[in-house]
């Protein structure tokens, strides 16, 4: 647990006490809705949930306001269900159809309990509308703006994140191997051995045990950042831009709202090695229009201060809206009784 969390009043659910829940949480998915519904939130006038799965399913008082900051509708339940199923083991493939059918029903019911949705991107707002039939307001997530002095860029690309199949780090590894470009991969995960096997001599794996200072050093020195995966927003390209370098290789159908094509980075149109390699070559040939200072300045639109201000203003406005609705309802009920 981060040190600054220790001063908070953190109250966990009974799920925290289930043996091996921290390691086998995926297998215990059917228990998660019950765990969140067990929270007693009757003393709260405002409930703010941060959800990519089940936390939006908490139960609140009828006169309380529940605002959900939604990172995504549950990916493995909705549009990514078939992809997750295809990458699962045989036992998971056997039980997934029945379990996911039940989860879809519960997830829609849970979404109906939310009074107001905030989406972390316009892409997620579209998915909320698609699967929950709900409107949402967009507030982009935040990133710490690095104010370290710029250093001379070195001749390597960087990618950072968990090494799981949906991050598609394999595209970056194969593209840089094909182009004979140096790539530094920071992160650990189940795909590490597979990625090592396909990597050429220009690919370096640093694992997931680096300190924050070491990761920052690579961010500052890299000449470009590769982000080939499908994400709901994708905060790592913003982190790269705070260091003043371009995000070369972002797929435009997903998670690219933080990148200005041709100015602070490039998009590649298809999630293939060929498309990413072409994007890297364009970056090598043409560069980007913005300077390091301008790229960092663009990243300030995702600052912590901006996020805190927008979120507070939104919550206060929705609280006022909700109170007005309650007042209007009470007047209507009084008129009906009269």
State the predicted function of each range.
Residues 1-56:
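Active-site donor-binding segments of glycosyltransferases and PAPS-dependent sulfotransferases
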Residues 86-117, 125:
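Membrane-proximal helix-turn-helix segments that form the acceptor-binding/catalytic region
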Residues 143, 149-184:
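Conserved donor-binding/catalytic core segment of Leloir-type glycosyltransferases
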Residues 193-213:
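Nucleotide-activated donor-binding/catalytic signature segment of Leloir-type glycosyltransferases, i.e.
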Residues 220-232, 245:
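Acidic donor-binding loop of glycosyltransferase active sites
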Residues 226, 246-251, 259:
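Short hydrophobic beta-strand element within catalytic cores of glycosyltransferases
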């Amino acid at each position: 647990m981060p040190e600054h969390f220790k001063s908070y009043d953190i109250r966990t659910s009974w799920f925290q006490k289930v043996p091996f829940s921290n390691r086998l949480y995926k297998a215990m998915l059917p228990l998660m809705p019950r765990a969140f519904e067990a929270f007693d939130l009757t003393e709260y006038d405002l409930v703010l949930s941060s959800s990519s799965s089940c936390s939006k399913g908490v139960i609140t008082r009828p006169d309380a306001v529940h605002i959900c900051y939604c990172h995504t509708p549950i990916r493995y339940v909705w549009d990514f269900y078939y992809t997750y199923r295809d990458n699962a083991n045989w036992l998971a493939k056997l039980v997934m159809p029945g379990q996911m059918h039940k989860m879809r029903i519960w997830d829609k019911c849970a979404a109906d309990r939310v009074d107001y949705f905030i989406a972390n991107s316009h892409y997620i707002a579209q998915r909320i509308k698609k699967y929950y039939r709900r409107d949402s307001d967009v507030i982009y997530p935040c990133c710490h703006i690095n104010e370290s002095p710029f250093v001379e860029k070195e001749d390597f690309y960087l990618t950072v994140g968990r090494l799981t199949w949906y991050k598609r780090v394999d595209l970056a590894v194969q593209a840089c191997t094909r182009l004979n470009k140096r790539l530094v991969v920071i992160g650990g995960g189940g795909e590490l051995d597979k990625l090592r096997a396909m990597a050429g001599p220009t690919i370096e794996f640093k694992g997931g045990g680096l300190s924050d200072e070491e990761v920052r050093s690579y961010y500052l020195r890299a000449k470009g950042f590769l982000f080939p995966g499908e994400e709901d927003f994708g905060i790592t390209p913003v982190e790269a831009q705070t260091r003043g370098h371009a995000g070369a290789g972002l797929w435009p159908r997903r998670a690219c709202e933080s990148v200005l094509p041709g100015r602070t980075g490039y998009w590649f149109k298809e999630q293939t090695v060929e498309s990413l390699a072409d994007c890297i070559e364009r970056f090598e040939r043409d560069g980007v229009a913005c300077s390091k200072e301008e790229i960092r300045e663009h990243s300030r639109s995702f600052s912590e201060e901006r996020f805190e201000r927008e979120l507070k203003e939104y919550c206060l406005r929705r609280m006022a809206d909700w109170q007005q609705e309650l007042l209007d309802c009470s007047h209507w009920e009084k008129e009906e009784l009269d």
